[in-house]
Amino acid sequence: MSRGLSTACAVGAAMMLSVSASYAGAGPFEGLAGVWTGRGTIQLEDGSTEKIRCKATYAVSGDAQGLNQTLLCASDSYKFELKSNVLAQGGVLSGTWSETSRNVGGTLGGRAGNGQFNVDVSAPAFTAKLKLTTNGNRQNVVISSEGQFRGASISLSRS
């Protein structure tokens, strides 16, 4: 899998699951709707790093149990667009995603609890683990993976 595609898969999965713990009384996606932007750093297999810029747009279902997301990210060497659909049922997260310019997609699953969200993301020849936290209008994402893309740390804020 190419470096750009691996990065797109991991970063996109992380962003689509940026769930807010402060809205636990309703569905886990309540309060997430809108546009979020931010920056971070990606670590590659050879130890090098690249800065990345992202913009996520979230549409939340009426019961706040479903999320549709579009994510645009870019670094100095590539860009990508990811779309995702995520459902929450009793603290269990599941969904699908696709990267439109590379015609690839996969599944995701995980658990939410105590303000921490642990998610496994998969596609053919790619897996990643994500840890997510949201506090008010700020989101932090930490990603770990094997292969050409080793990980990322990204901070977002709501516009």
Show which residues each predicted segment covers.
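Positively charged n-region of N-terminal signal peptides that target proteins for export
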Residues: 1-6
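Bacterial N-terminal signal peptides
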Residues: 8-19
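Central antiparallel beta-sheet cores of small beta-barrel/beta-sandwich binding domains
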Residues: 25-135, 141-159
